[in-house]
Each structure stands twice: as structure tokens, then as C-alpha cells.
Amino acid sequence: MAFSPWQILSPVQWAKWTWSAVRGGAAGEDEAGGPEGDPEEEDSQAETKSLSFSSDSEGNFETPEAETPIRSPFKESCDPSLGLAGPGAKSQESQEADEQLVAEVVEKCSSKTCSKPSENEVPQQAIDSHSVKNFREEPEHDFSKISIVRPFSIETKDSTDISAVLGTKAAHGCVTAVSGKALPSSPPDALQDEAMTEGSMGVTLEASAEADLKAGNSCPELVPSRRSKLRKPKPVPLRKKAIGGEFSDTNAAVEGTPLPKASYHFSPEELDENTSPLLGDARFQKSPPDLKETPGTLSSDTNDSGVELGEESRSSPLKLEFDFTEDTGNIEARKALPRKLGRKLGSTLTPKIQKDGISKSAGLEQPTDPVARDGPLSQTSSKPDPSQWESPSFNPFGSHSVLQNSPPLSSEGSYHFDPDNFDESMDPFKPTTTLTSSDFCSPTGNHVNEILESPKKAKSRLITSGCKVKKHETQSLALDACSRDEGAVISQISDISNRDGHATDEEKLASTSCGQKSAGAEVKGEPEEDLEYFECSNVPVSTINHAFSSSEAGIEKETCQKMEEDGSTVLGLLESSAEKAPVSVSCGGESPLDGICLSESDKTAVLTLIREEIITKEIEANEWKKKYEETRQEVLEMRKIVAEYEKTIAQMIEDEQRTSMTSQKSFQQLTMEKEQALADLNSVERSLSDLFRRYENLKGVLEGFKKNEEALKKCAQDYLARVKQEEQRYQALKIHAEEKLDKANEEIAQVRTKAKAESAALHAGLRKEQMKVESLERALQQKNQEIEELTKICDELIAKLGKTD
């Protein structure tokens, strides 16, 4: 299979360089692709309109692009290695088998480093059309219910489970999110996982694909765009297969089928830290650290016990999580769809991040080559580890995995490009295979595609405005885990060493924040320490913003947020599948740059540059933090001042209102008094008029009284004269009366004397009569007594006589 220079790009670079082309050329691609893609394209367009793709710099940064720091081409030459978190020990036989597979895959990759651009892939169109037809024959796929960023995500619970999830949903181009909780890496178990998953890759892939198909989960197709220079990708046919029954077919298809030319399925709206545009629809895969070096670099996070982790990852049931509803971060991002479609926006970043997250998980595991141990770690954690800086395969600025060898893909594999479902860490150039073939592309191809960037650097985005700086525990990263893949990484630096470009605000801040974390870890020398990360609510963060970390914080936050929202986990998916079928199987898709080797001096130089860049970025991050704190203090002070000002203004307004109310009341009262006074005045006037009339009347009456008085005076004089005459007559009559009275009195005295004499005589006669009566009464009483006595004597005599008789 041939890779064009455009295919060997980091996710953000590819998106920045091809977004305008992809949006512009989709109309022409629709005609070539046939009528099959119309419904899915319309759905994708709707999703594109709903997703936000504006640059973070537009609203949050004012730094022009020309002033942003220039990224060194060596920054992305190595990818950070972070072992899968998982206890247990890998047997020596598994290690030897891995080393043999490393050698074989490196030999396979050596012959395919040179390639032509994918524009000439004519046979691939037929394959894509056939894939689209087969893909549309699946009725249960509901494009509207697919989560744009992580339609299929797997997580582990209790921060002790390995996030072991299949890395690619190659059969239908869906982006697989690995959002296990970050765990301390346990390389022995991780190596065992890889050895086991080599034999059972097809089984695991088919299990995840079958679960996806049952859940109606499929990837939306490419949105018809306006300025696309790239052919419209079409999804590969999806086939439901039983895990056990199709295992042998899967191995056969993976091993024997050459990698066909296929179109990439690129969806800028699914551009996510978890997905590389070079990997197609596969999420980044995480390779375990070196067995020898990981014990020293294991996180001191003792809460995540290794033994329990291994047991849970093997014994817990397989749980596939399908996100049929878009999370709030994506919804809010879609509401804020920008009008500048020429610039790609990082995927929406949900604010929640796992605290002990090392790795998003092995669910996006690389093709389980032995190179996988040395291979790429998925960019699912933003936590750099100073112990990984010595690793030749440590790429703090790479957006996905270390260089790995990839076995050929199945003939049915095709690229899928869907701007609606594009994830920043998704590689649209990474071919995806059907479920029968291995769902993993070459780790080496992934790393090559990652580090070979276009002349202009991709722009990572990290919005710092409205962000809170939180403490985040970092895991010790085994930088020497990739030491066994020395010949596959740094030789590619020569291809990108002469390329240069301006980093955007997001890229600068990404490397700043990440460099701060890495440098802090290096200086302190602690396997685990609290590092600050920017937690932005609903802020898009591109893949490169924590690119130097083997597991990017943006991806981890986003994936973990989705996983926590969906609430379903898959524990030890690769381990369980590897236990069932620990047969080594070649992974699909060969790397375009096979067998590229790097010398120790090149590795040392690259690591030195990376360290210097990390220190510089950490210093810059500290400066930004100081500026942020100063600005925050100023803002707080200004808020206080504004609050006081508002209080004062409010008090003044209230006083003014009170004064106005009082004045208004006084005015109303005075108005009422005035009206009352006017009424009183009117009544007084009426009274005065009445009084005047009465006065006039009384004047007439008074004149009449004067006339009457004169008449009465005359009468009085007459009466006085008459009184005098009558008085004289009275005196004469009085004298005459007195004389008469004297005579009468004398006569009365005489009569009284006669009467007294007569009464005395009468009294004497009466006395006599009374004496007579009294004497008669006494005699009567005596007679009565005598009669009684006689009666008694008679009665006694009669009684005596009666007794004698």
C-alpha cells in the first residue's frame, strides 16, 4: 500500500492542512462515490453544522500565528511510551515471541517506505464503493445516534481496571474511545496482554465490532465539503461475526491478505485526541512499557493494586459501551459552530479528567506485535513521566503511537474520512479492515504518520480562558519501554528535519502545559507527583496540546468523561481475548516506512531537544500560570471594586429613589393641601357673599327695630304715667283694707273665745258620760263572771248526778 506525504501527518497537522481541501472537494467526491453516500453525507453535514470548529485562538488567544513558537521537527519523532496499567507478570516465552515478531515486522516494513500519494488509488474507489454498499446493507446502524467523538468507548472501573479496548473499529470506521481510568502501569501484565492479544486480535476485534453492530453503532460518512482535494472515503462493509466461529477466518484474512489501497475516512468533527487521522477510525493505542524498566517507573499510586487489576481485567465480563447520545461537551461545541471552516477546531473537551489516569487503555491496543511493547501509547493521558525521557521511542510532541510494524490489512480495508466524526487523534490515512481482518494497523506506520508532518506545523488548541488549574497526579512513564524499537523511530527524523512551521496558540500552550508537567516530573524525580493541568469546561483541545505525553490529558478527560457518562466498562478486553486465543497473528496494514532505524546518538539528540523543549515549555507554562494568577488577582480586585461600585451606585440609586419618592409624596400632599385651601377659599367666599346678603337684610331689620324702639319708648312713657296713677290708687285701697282687716281680727277673737267656752262645757259632759259607761262595763263583767262560775257549778252538779245515776 502506498502512502502519500499527506498521509504521513499528525492528526492536527493533517486536519489543518486538509480541512479546507476536504470541505471543498466533497461535492466532487459525491459524484464519483455514487449515490450510496448521499444519506450518510447529509447526516454528516448536519453533524458538521452542529459541531464547533472555530479556532480557540479566535475567542481565547490574541497571539498571532507568526509570533507563536516554532515546533522542532524532532518533537514528534518519538511517541511517549506508557505501559498499560495492569498487574501480573509476563512469561519469558511471551517476551521471546514478542521479540521475534518485532524482527519479522521490521523486515516486512522495510520494503514499503516509499509510496505515492493516495490520490492515484483508483482500485481503492471500487473497494470503497463496494464497502459503502455493504455498509449500507446493515439496517441497524443509526448514524444519528452515534457519538461523534467516541461512539464506542470502553472503560474500567474503580481506577484499578485496565482499560483494554480494541484499538480500531476497522470494519465500519468508527472511532473507538479508550477511556479507562488512569492506572499505574504494570508492564509485566501489559506485555502479557500484547502477547496474548497477538493471537486473539481477530476475535477481540470481531467481538467489539459485533457489539457495535448490535448496538446500532456505525460511523457516519464523509460530509460533502466545499474545498476537498481528497477523495471521499466510504465505509468498509460491516460484517457480524461470532467471536469463536470467526477466529480462524480472522487470522487467515489478517495473515494472508495484502493491504489494499483504500480511501481514508476523515471526520474533522470527530477530530479528537483519542483518534489519529493517520489511523483512520482507530483510537490511539497504548503499548506497555519495557518489562525490565517498568518496575522502577511504576506509579506509586498504591490504590490501584496490581494483582486485583489483573484478576478483574480477566474475570470481569466484557462490556462494550456505545454512546448513542452526544455528551454535553459535544452538544455545546456543536451549538457554537464557527463560520471559519478553513481552520480546524480541536475536539470538544469534557472538563472531567481522571486523577490517576496513566492510560486511556489498551482497548485501542496496537496490533499486538512485540513492537507493541515498544510501540505507541495512546494519547489518552496528559501526564508525562521523566522516566520516559530516556526512551528513544518517547515522543512528547507526537500525537500518537511510536513507530511499529504493521502486518498487511485485509483486502476489504478502506480509509474512512468523515469530517463530522473526525477525531483529532484519529488517523484518516490509517486503513481500516473488516472484522475478519485484524483491526489494527501497523504501529510503525502509525508513528511514521505521526512524526512526518507537513511543512506547516499543526495547531494544537488549548483554551486557557475560563480554565481552572487543578492538581493532577501523574504516573511514572516508562521511557525506556520503547528502547527495543530503536531502529524504527528516529531514522524518520531526516524526513522531517528540514520542515518548519508556526505553531498556533493552542500548540504553544499545549507544549507549554505539557512541558511544564514533564519538566516538573524530571526535576523532582518523583515517579508520581501532582501536576497542574488546565481543566477547561467544554473547550476543544487538539491532539498536539499534550502531544509529548504518552497519554494526553485532553484525550483522557474527554474519553473518561464520555465513559463516565455512559457508565459501561470493559475490563481486560485484550487480556480476556488473548487468554481465549493466545495465537500470534499478523496485524493488518503495513507501514509505509518499514525498517527505519535510529542510532543512539540520534536518539540522545532527540531526547535532549525534547528535554530542552519540555523545560522551556514548563518555564513558559509557569510564566503563564503566574500571569494567570496575577490576572486572576487583578480580576478579583476589580470584581471587588466593581462590586463596591455597584453597591454604591445601587445605594445612590436607592437614596435617589427614596428622595424622589419623598418629594413626590410631599408634592402630592402639597397639591392636596392646595386643592383643599382652594376649596376652603371658595367656601369662604360663598360664606362671605351669604354674610353680606344677611348683613344687608339685617340693616333693613335694624332700621325697623329703631322705628319700633321709638314707638315703644312712647308707649313706655305712657305706661309710666299710668303706673303712677295706679300706685296712688293702690295706696288708698291699702289703707282701706287695713282698716277692714283690723275689724275682722277683732271679730274673730271674740268668736274664738266663745267657742273655747262651749267646747269646755261639752268636754265635761262627755267625761261624765264616759264614767258612766265604764261603770256599766265593770258591772257587766262581774255579772259575766258570776254566770260562768254558776255554769261550772251546774256542770259539776250535773256530772255528779250523772255518775250517781
Curated annotation (Swiss-Prot):
It comes from Homo sapiens (Human). Gene3D superfamilies: 1.20.5.1700. This is Transforming acidic coiled-coil-containing protein 1. Residues 206-427 are annotated as: Interaction with YEATS4. A motif (Bipartite nuclear localization signal 2) lies at residues 455-471. InterPro entries: TACC, TACC_C. The modification Phosphoserine is found at residues 4, 10, 44, 147, 153, 228, 248, 276, 381, 406, 483, 591. GO terms for molecular function: nuclear estrogen receptor binding; nuclear glucocorticoid receptor binding; nuclear receptor binding; nuclear retinoic acid receptor binding; nuclear retinoid X receptor binding; nuclear thyroid hormone receptor binding; peroxisome proliferator activated receptor binding; transcription coactivator activity.
